[in-house]
């Protein structure tokens, strides 16, 4: 650990600087699928990953250094940096090793598993660093904007990093999932969306009943514009979709139960509409949980605005995302990762519609990856300009003082 701390304090290592000059190579779900299904070759995957993984790590490691020093000096952020440095150096050992050696391929597989496990707690640990920073230095709008920009890119990079590793380890690790034998790595070529909806609902329902002893029911409706009367299927990563749906169901259930806690005749159902068109697959989750004021919608996706109580990371440093208020922003990153999105439409006093948009075609579902370049650098260095729209004063003017003299 001392070595990594020393390295972190040095100027950008030449290898990190060199790899960060390359842009990541985004893949589509179709490319993931075609490679895993038709011509899965461990040598080819190895040769791609031994370059691509360091590129993605180096891009985000360069960007970390643009954060405010007061944030970089938080122990939790330093710990995350040490993990990234260690993983980068371990992957770099395979830069020139021959793919023709079976032992090299096996060792590389084991390194990928070790790296993935090392990064398991990146999200809560980085969140801990943000909390430490906010508690000590307070809230600054400009710095908050930069932290929001960085964390969206940092966590997206992590999602992509794990996607690449999972595909390689699942395809070449020798462990076929008996529950999902038709999956290509972590991708389901015929993902039944309604089934994932119901699985996510049941999991959220179980938690809701544990805490509140009750839970709203679920109503699901499908509309398949491409093939009427057929169940909606999509080529997708079920674990990503489950993550998004579980978070939205959890929020809808909590809002509904808390609003109608004194009601004796039951609760309004949470309604889900799944639609498939030519371009988009959309999933709308609607509740009657009272809604959210318009001014608070953006805050729900802001890492610095979290009002959740500070969770403990001991003894394993692991913590649920919801404990940091990161559930919604991370879910939106999962949706955006393959060119989709997650949006909230709320009517205060009534309820909220949450809509997940996914690409209907796997050939259009390309990874959306952050790139470290001059545009990114300028985002951190440009000072905020004065607002060019009027802002209401905290103390409105007395209009009577400005009456025209007769």
Swiss-Prot record:
Sequence similarity: Belongs to the PDK/BCKDK protein kinase family.
Q: Report keywords, A-Z.
A: ATP-binding, Charcot-Marie-Tooth disease, Disease variant, Kinase, Mitochondrion, Neurodegeneration, Neuropathy, Nucleotide-binding, Transferase, Transit peptide
Where is ATP bound in this sequence?
247-254, 287, 306-307, 323-328
GO CC annotation:
mitochondrial matrix; mitochondrion; nucleolus
Pfam (any one)? BCDHK_Adom3
The record's catalysed reaction(s) read: L-seryl-[pyruvate dehydrogenase E1 alpha subunit] + ATP = O-phospho-L-seryl-[pyruvate dehydrogenase E1 alpha subunit] + ADP + H(+)
Tissues and organs where the protein is expressed, per its UniProt entry: Expressed in heart, skeletal muscle, spinal cord, as well as fetal and adult brain.
Q: How is its activity regulated?
A: Activated by interaction with DLAT. Inhibited by AZD7545, dichloroacetate and radicicol.
Q: Which disease is it linked to?
A: Charcot-Marie-Tooth disease, X-linked dominant, 6: A form of Charcot-Marie-Tooth disease, a disorder of the peripheral nervous system, characterized by progressive weakness and atrophy, initially of the peroneal muscles and later of the distal muscles of the arms.
Q: What is the effect of changing residue 219 to A?
A: In a head & neck squamous cell carcinoma sample; somatic mutation
**Which EC number applies?**
2.7.11.2
GO-annotated molecular function: ATP binding; protein kinase activity; protein serine/threonine kinase activity; pyruvate dehydrogenase (acetyl-transferring) kinase activity
The protein depicted here goes by the name [Pyruvate dehydrogenase (acetyl-transferring)] kinase isozyme 3, mitochondrial
Residues annotated as region Disordered?
383-406
| Entry annotated with the keyword Metal-binding | no
InterPro entries on file: AK/P_DHK_N_sf, BCDHK/PDK_N, BCKD/PDK, HATPase_C_sf, His_kinase_dom
Kindly give the PROSITE patterns that the UniProt entry links to this protein: HIS_KIN
């Amino acid at each position: 650990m001392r070595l990594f701390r020393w390295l972190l304090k040095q100027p950008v290592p030449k290898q990190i600087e060199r790899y960060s000059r390359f842009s990541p190579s985004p893949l589509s779900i179709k490319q993931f699928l075609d490679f895993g299904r038709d011509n899965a070759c461990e040598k080819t995957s190895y040769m791609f990953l031994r370059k691509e993984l360091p590129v993605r790590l180096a891009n985000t490691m360069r960007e970390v250094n643009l954060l405010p020093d007061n944030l970089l000096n938080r122990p939790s952020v330093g710990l995350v940096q040490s993990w990234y440095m260690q993983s980068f150096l371990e992957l770099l050992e395979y830069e020139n090793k021959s793919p023709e050696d079976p032992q090299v391929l096996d060792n590389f597989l084991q390194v990928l598993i070790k790296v993935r496990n090392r990064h398991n707690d990146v999200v809560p640990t980085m969140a801990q660093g943000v909390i430490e920073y906010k508690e000590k230095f307070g809230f600054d709008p400009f710095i908050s904007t930069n932290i929001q920009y960085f964390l969206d890119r940092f966590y997206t990079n992590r999602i992509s990093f794990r996607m690449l590793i999972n595909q390689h380890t699942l395809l070449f690790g020798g462990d076929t999932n008996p529950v999902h034998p038709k999956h290509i790595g972590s991708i389901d070529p015929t993902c039944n969306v309604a089934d994932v909806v119901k699985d996510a609902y049941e999991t959220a329902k179980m938690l809701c009943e544990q805490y509140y002893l009750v839970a709203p029911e679920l109503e699901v409706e499908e509309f398949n514009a491409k093939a009427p009367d057929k169940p909606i299927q999509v080529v997708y990563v079920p674990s990503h979709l489950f993550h998004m749906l579980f978070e939205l169901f959890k929020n809808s259930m909590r809002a509904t139960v808390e609003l109608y806690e004194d009601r004796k005749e039951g609760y309004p159902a949470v309604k889900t509409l799944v639609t498939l068109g030519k371009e988009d697959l959309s999933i709308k989750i609607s509740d009657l949980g009272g809604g959210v004021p318009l001014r608070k919608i953006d805050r729900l996706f802001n890492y610095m605005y979290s009002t959740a109580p500070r969770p403990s990371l001991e003894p394993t440093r692991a913590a649920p995302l919801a404990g940091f208020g990161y559930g919604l922003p991370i879910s939106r990153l999962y949706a955006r990762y393959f060119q989709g999105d997650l949006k909230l439409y709320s009517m205060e006093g009534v309820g909220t519609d949450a809509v997940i948009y996914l690409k209907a075609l796997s050939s259009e579902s390309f990874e959306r990856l952050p790139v470290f370049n001059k545009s990114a650098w300028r985002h951190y260095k440009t000072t905020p300009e004065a607002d060019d729209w009027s802002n209401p004063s905290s103390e409105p003017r007395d209009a009577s003082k400005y009456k025209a003299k007769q």
